[in-house]
Amino acid sequence: MQQSEGNKMSTLVLELRQGDLMVVNGAPIRFRNRTRIELAAKARFLFGKQIMAPDAANTPARRIYFALQTAYIGADEERGPGLAAARDLIRDFMEATTSPTVREMLDRAREAAEGDDCYSALRIARRVMRHEEEVLGIPPLPSPRRDPLPNPAPG
């Protein structure tokens, strides 16, 4: 990932591999070949291992991440409910955890999300997920990057 600056507008250049998944402004895009794209306008996007599938949200920290992801890249009508769900899940996790460090991280994630900086909130939530994985002894999530491409629809 690199940024290049033009006269007035900054662009973001991403190199994506075959099979990579990217969500831009709520629209999922799967790349069939290796490609390089340039985002020339502000967009809400995640790609590769940043994207969590709904069925992977199977622990408290992962549910927080998924709710924040929805608040960030969901369709317009999903973003508000995603943020509300994240608030509730963060509150519940903060009440249940004995770790002051995790409480502080969750508080920062909530503040970032409420300040419309869901990308930063997601980065913090990933740290909470790693902590949870270590404490519970569960494996980290696999990357969706190499999921097989679906067969094209007939017709």
Residue ranges of predicted features:
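Terminal leader/tail segments of proteins
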Residues: 1-155
